[in-house]
């Protein structure tokens, strides 16, 4: 319920001036105990009457009495009052012109608030920008920068799909993956991260070895005819095959570099045990472990893809007016020719994946065999070192037994060396008898201890 302010209550607070040079009335705010009064021209009130709600005025008057107020606060308060007054005027039976002015003011305030909220959101969250290499189906290569929103809009992907190829998540997304979506295929093959679409492919981290190898493999294949003279495959399949070729060739090249070194070490190590050779064996073993893990991860990815016919069929229907039936994943196309071509491509894709799976398994198996040979050589070296360590321990024990026997003889000699009269020094033969007894006793004690240790199989 809107109430008109009582003159006795609000005369000291609000005073309308009739002598203003402006066509619209001016509103003066007079506060007790504050700075001199100031006036604020309100042009929006030229045709709209002011209605104050009693609760709002009372609460606002309390706030005025408690704290000092600035001109900005009055402006904000008046805007809120103006919006509420316009709402009240629209609910009551006011004129059409008054309602139109209130709606315009409220729309302006709402638009300004929405724009400010969007600006604050954009300032709070920084949208990532990717620098990619774009390879088109025609063979044109260009480097461009694209933000996340544009990338999602152009490829038809979702934000969670980008995480598999995001270069900033390289450490967390190191497992190879091939994700098939409606309009794009996402490739994550170690250092190669790309998005293959119908007419182009976007390559992230193109300066890395995997990106350069992928571009070098893809460019010769972008021609009207394939290498065997038959019709070329769709561009996205060419991109997938080029990615697999570049990745497997890199694994095979690493295997060819490591294999001769390991074979040479296996021939030398049984006879030569030096620190340099052992260190080279350790480094070669570490490289074999890394190569085997990468080949095994790629092999597992290809196996999972071959065991899921739904993903293969999704690759085949990209860019065609075809859908997959939910019950049995059967192809449903508007044109019979599209269905026939999709079924033929499905067989080609399966054969293609099986071919690269065999190459990957061969590389993985050879790396595992070399790694097993290196581990066996390490076991042989450990046994050899253990036998030598045992020989050294036996020799040390033999020296300790001899030292014990000699120490017993030295004890007897020390006893006779004391300045006590034993009457043996008066006889000339006593020296020779004592010396002979010490030597013979030490030898007998040594052989007795040696025979005891031999019976206990310590020697």
Curated annotation (Swiss-Prot):
It comes from the Eukaryota. The chain crosses the membrane at residues 397-417, 430-450. It is found in: Plastid, Chloroplast membrane. Induction: By light. A motif (Required for magnesium transport activity) lies at residues 417-419. One of its GO terms (molecular function) is magnesium ion transmembrane transporter activity. Residues 76-122 are annotated as: Disordered. InterPro entries: MRS2-like (IPR039204). Expressed in the green part of the plant. Preferentially expressed in the spongy mesophyll cells and stomata of young leaves but also detected in cotyledons and at the base of the leaf petioles. One of its GO terms (biological process) is magnesium ion homeostasis. It is a multi-pass membrane protein. Residues 1-62 form a transit peptide. Keywords: Chloroplast, Ion transport, Magnesium, Membrane, Plastid, Transit peptide, Transmembrane, Transmembrane helix, Transport. Residues 101-110 have a biased composition (Basic and acidic residues). One of its GO terms (cellular component) is chloroplast membrane. Residues 111-122 have a biased composition (Low complexity). Has the ability to complement a mutant in yeast lacking magnesium transport capability. Belongs to the CorA metal ion transporter (MIT) (TC 1.A.35.5) family. This is Magnesium transporter MRS2-11, chloroplastic. The lineage of its organism: Eukaryota, Viridiplantae, Streptophyta, Embryophyta, Tracheophyta. The gene is MRS2-11.
